[in-house]
């Protein structure tokens, strides 16, 4: 299998890259769209970025919001017609709590658009699991607690929920199909000492990969690093040992546990990635990324409440330049490293391109 986590995927879409600057006047469809169909989730994770008081992310999120069925079906039609390559369903809430998810992915399964989802795994069962197993490209399940008791404490759920999620993953793999099932472990001070055994337990369930990431506790990079400093060395050692002992051609361990930049300041004044991977929220608003979702003051680029996604997208190139990252994105940004690569590519001197 090729590289799953690489910042260079966008460079396979040269025409899209070259269309990004304002002065081209050209609007092409996004390559990938992240859709947040509902803000409902039955779990209450303490570190959830959309609920944390100390993070700008999700500050205007309303739990009751969801995308109406008719609007979702209209949007899927637009996505197919526009030539969008992929859709990821995520939160906000948990997409598997969206009442029309099954109908939505059934519709997508009859098209060329690839789809995936992020979920807590509690509802990964029944027909919707079969559709994802047979037609989805990947699923990633977020986990923190390492057993029934700890999982219950993390998420405010019953002490049976952890076993249920683990069984759902095991049963999902038994369906067959080509959907790549991964787990995302969000590391904090509570589970840091249990990572090695936890990764072994996850492998034994039969999933394809596990990703290790730090919880984000603040808009300030220094504060994030200060939180992780007491556990940092131990976590790195456990993950290294797990990779040596458990990783093979059937089980990938992707280590994304690292210190964050001390400063989140951005030195560029427009965001290329909002034209590549925009976010559609459950409130029917369009945002540049998941880090700016549900931030109406600084992250809103448009709405499909009274128009279709296609009509909004092609209405004006100016919509994509409303946000100045150097002024309003001085916080954690999932697209920052990708943006810098794209901008470096676009800013290369044309007279000197041959001098590789």
Walk through the language-model features, giving the residues of each.
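Radical SAM enzyme [4Fe-4S]-AdoMet core and its adjacent flexible, acidic
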Residues: 2, 36, 58-60, 67, ...
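Conserved alpha-helical substructure of the radical SAM core
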Residues: 2-138, 229, 234-235, 354-356
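Flexible mid-to-C-terminal extensions adjoining Fe-S/redox cofactors in radical SAM and related proteins
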Residues: 3-29, 266, 285-286, 290-356
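Residue-level signal for mature regions of secreted extracellular proteins and peptides
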Residues: 34, 38-41, 264, 282, ...
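Short cysteine clusters
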Residues: 41, 45-48, 271, 289, ...
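Secreted/processed peptides and extracellular or luminal domains of membrane proteins
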Residues: 47, 51-54, 233, 277, ...
């Amino acid at each position: 299998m090729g590289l799953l986590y690489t910042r260079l995927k966008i460079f396979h879409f040269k025409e899209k890259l070259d269309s990004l600057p304002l002065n081209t006047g050209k609007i092409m469809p996004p390559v990938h769209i992240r859709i947040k169909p509902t803000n409902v989730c039955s779990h209450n994770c303490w570190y959830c970025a959309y609920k944390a008081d100390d993070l700008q992310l999700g500050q205007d999120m309303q739990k009751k919001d969801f995308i109406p069925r008719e609007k979702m079906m209209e949007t899927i039609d637009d996505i197919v017609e526009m030539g969008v390559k992929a859709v990821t369903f995520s939160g906000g809430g948990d997409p598997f709590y969206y009442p029309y998810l099954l109908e939505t992915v059934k519709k997508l399964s009859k098209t060329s658009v690839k789809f995936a989802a992020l979920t807590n795994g509690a509802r990964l069962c029944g027909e919707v699991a079969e559709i994802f197993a047979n037609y989805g490209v990947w699923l990633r399940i977020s986990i923190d607690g390492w057993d029934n008791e700890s999982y219950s404490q993390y998420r405010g759920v019953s002490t049976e929920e952890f076993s249920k999620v683990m069984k759902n993953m095991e049963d999902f793999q038994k369906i067959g199909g080509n959907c790549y099932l991964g787990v995302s472990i969000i590391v904090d001070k509570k589970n840091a000492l249990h990572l090695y055994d936890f990764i072994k337990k996850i492998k034994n369930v039969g999933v394809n990969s596990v990703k290790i990431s730090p919880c984000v506790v603040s808009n300030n990079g220094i504060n994030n690093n200060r939180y992780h400093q007491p556990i940092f060395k131990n976590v790195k050692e456990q993950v290294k040992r797990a990779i040596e002992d458990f990783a093979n051609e059937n089980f990938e361990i992707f280590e994304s546990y690292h210190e964050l930049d001390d400063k989140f300041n951005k030195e560029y004044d427009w965001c290329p990635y909002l034209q590549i991977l925009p976010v559609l929220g459950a409130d029917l608003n369009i945002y540049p990324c998941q880090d700016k979702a549900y931030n109406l003051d600084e992250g809103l680029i448009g709405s499909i409440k009274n128009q279709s996604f296609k009509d909004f997208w092609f209405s004006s190139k100016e919509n994509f330049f409303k946000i100045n990252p150097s002024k309003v994105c001085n916080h954690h940004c999932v697209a920052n490293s990708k943006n810098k690569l794209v901008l470096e590519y676009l800013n290369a001197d044309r007279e000197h391109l041959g001098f590789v």
